[in-house]
C-alpha cells in the first residue's frame, strides 16, 4: 500500500499554493506601507471590547414550557396541553365541537357555601349551583352538556393549591385533571370530531407538548417554576408562535458589529451529530483461552446530511475519558478463561465528540465568544461479543447501556489526514441505563455501564440532534481567512531545533513499548495519517501538508520520480546476461555476496549482487506505482514516526516537515523487495542479497537475473516485510500452508496481526528488527 504522499509525487500532482509563493516572495522583499488599521490592530490578540450580540432563540428543540400567552380563541393542536393560569374566579375556558359536546371549566374561590351563581357560557347567561368547602384550596369544576339546548352537569372537580388547570385534545378525547393536589390525576371526555374543538380561554395560558406530560402534572400538583424573577413577564398574543421572522433562525448568519477590517458574526446552526465507538480487542498468547485487553479507542466518522435544503459534509471524532477497568479470572490453569482488563464507561466517565462541517461557521473559527449548544440525549446500548475458545462452550459478553447528556461545549482541533480543523468539542456526561451487562457462562452478571466489547451493537452510528450558536470575529472581507498566530512564525535556529528533535526522538525509543509500536505498525498507514493523532498543539497544521510536499520536491526520492521509467529500463538493460551469470546454480547460497566468486563478467556491472541492488534501489518507486494491497516498509516507518510525534514535546510546525522528509528517506535502510511469478518468488535487497524459491516447499532455485528484470518491469513489486530467511525459519519450526505463505509474501496486515496476537516469536522478532532500524 503506497503512501499517499508518494502517489501524488508519482503522478506529478504535487502543487504549491499561490499564497505560499506570495509568502516566500514577501519574505525576501520589504516595503513600508501606511494603512488605517482600525481598533483591532493594536495587539496580536483578539479584541476585548466585544459587542452585545444577539441571544438566539429557535424552535429546533421544542421547549418544555412555552408561554405565557394572552387570552384568545383558537383551535389548539392535537397532543398539546393548555396549562391555564387564572388570577380570578369565574369561567376560565370553554370549548365545543358544535355537535355533541359543550364543555366549560369554572374556578371557585375557597370557603364558598352552596349557592347559585350566574355565568356567561358560550354567550348565554346560565344559572349554576356551586360550592367550595375547602378553606385554602381553589376548586375547578367542569360543566358539560351534549346538546345545544340541554342542561349542564358538573364533573371531575379539582381542588388546587397552585391554582392551575390543564386541558388537551388527544386520541378522540378531551383530557383534563381531577382530584386534589398534590395528587391530581388526568381524566377525559369522549367527543366526536375532537380535533375540530375550538377553545376560548379567559386567562393567561402556557403550551406543553404531550411528551412532557409528567412536567405538566408536576406543575399542576406543585406550581410553575420561577421564570426570570428579576424581570416583568408580559404575556404574548398566541399569534406570536407563528411569527418566526421575529426570532433568530435555526440556521442564520447575523452581523453583530463591523469595522473597516473586522466584523463580528453570529452563527446559528442546526446540527446532526453522528458518531460511533471504536475498540481494540487483544488476545493473549498461549492456548487461546486468555484475552489481555478490551479497550475503547478514538473513532472518526465522516457523513453528509441535509440542513435547510443544503447538503452538509461533517466529520466527527468520538473519544472517551474516565474509563473503569474490570477483569475476570476464571482460574490459574492455562485452559481457564481470563480477561486481564476490559474497559467500561459509567456515570463517572465522559464522552467527547469533536464536530466539524464545511459550513461558513467553521471557516474562521479562531476568535470565538458566546459559544452555546443545546443537544438532545441518546442511549447507547451494547451488543454481544463471543470469546471463541478452542474447546467448550464460548462465554460471551452481552448487554450494558449508558445515556449521553450534554455537559458543555468548547473549541478543539481535529487532525485529519490532510489538515487540522478548528472544531467544536461537545462533552457528554453519562448515566447508566438498563439493561445491565454480563459475561454469560461465568459468574459475572448484573453490572452496569457500557463495556468496550461491542459498544455499537451492530449500528453504523449513533445520532444526536441539536443546535449551537457562537459569535466569531472574522475579517470584513469574506474572501480573507482569519490569520493563525503560528502561520507567520520566523524560522530561527532551525538546525538546532532539528538536532534537539532528533535526540528526543531517538531517546523516546527506550520509552515506547515495542508492543505499542507493533500494534500501530501493522495498521495500513498513509504518510499523512501520522497527523491524525498528534497531541501537540500545532495551529499551523493546515500548511504542514504543503510544506512536506515542498520538502519532498527537493528530496532524493522525488528527484528520481521524473526518470523512474528510464531508470528502470536502463537498470534492466544494463544487467549482464552472459552465460556465466545464468549458470550460477542453487549451490550458491542466497546469503553470500557472489561478487567474490564471479570474476569473469566483463560488464561494467561486476556481479549479480550489485546488479540486483541497482534494480532494488528503484523498486521502492516501482512498488508505489503498482499499488500492491499489502503493507510496505513506508507504512511501518510512518507508524513509528507517528508514535514518536505523539509523545514528543518539542514538535513545531517548522521542524515537522523536515522530520517527516528525513524519516521517509532514512527509516528502514535495509529493504528487500520481491516479485511473484506463479509459484516462484524472486527477491532482492538493497544490500545486494538475492534469492529465488518455490512457495509450496521454500526450496531455493537458481536466480534468473533476466527473468527478474523482466518481471520488475511488468509485475507488481511487493515489500518483503517477512523476508525469505524468516519465512523458511517459520516453515521449518511451525509449518505453514500455501495460502498462509502467499498472505505473508503479500504482507497482508491481517495475517501478520494474527501471528503477532498469537505471540509467534519468529514473526514478532522480524517486525521488531524493522522497527529498531527507525532512527533519525
From Swiss-Prot:
| Any coiled-coil regions, as ranges | 484-511
User: Entry's SUPFAM superfamilies?
Assistant: Concanavalin A-like lectins/glucanases, VP4 membrane interaction domain
Motif YGL motif per record, residues:
448-450
| Similarity comment | Belongs to the rotavirus VP4 family.
Name the cystine pairs: 203-216, 318-380
The UniProt annotation puts the region (Spike foot) at: 510-776
Report residue spans for region: Spike head. 65-224
Naming one, the record's GO cellular component terms include: viral outer capsid
> Which species does this protein come from?
Rotavirus A (isolate RVA/Dog/United States/K9/1981/G3P5A[3]) (RV-A)
Which positions does the motif KID motif occupy?
Answer: 644-646
The record's region (Spike body and stalk (antigen domain)) falls at: 248-479
Task: Tell me which InterPro entries the record gives.
Answer: ConA-like_dom_sf, Rota_A_VP4, Rota_VP4_MID, Rota_VP4_MID_sf, VP4_concanavalin-like, VP4_helical
What are the boundaries of the region Hydrophobic? 389-409
Question: By what name is this protein known?
Answer: Outer capsid protein VP4
- Residue ranges of the motif DGE motif: 308-310
Query: Residue numbers for the site described as Cleavage?
Result: 231-232, 241-242, 247-248
- Note in the entry: In group A rotaviruses, VP4 defines the P serotype.
Q: Which UniProt keywords apply?
A: Capsid protein, Coiled coil, Disulfide bond, Hemagglutinin, Host cell membrane, Host cytoplasm, Host cytoskeleton, Host endoplasmic reticulum, Host membrane, Host-virus interaction, Membrane, Outer capsid protein, Viral attachment to host cell, Viral penetration into host cytoplasm, Viral penetration via permeabilization of host membrane, Virion, Virus entry into host cell
Q: Where is this site: Binding to sialic acid?
A: 101, 190
Name one process (GO BP) from the record. virion attachment to host cell
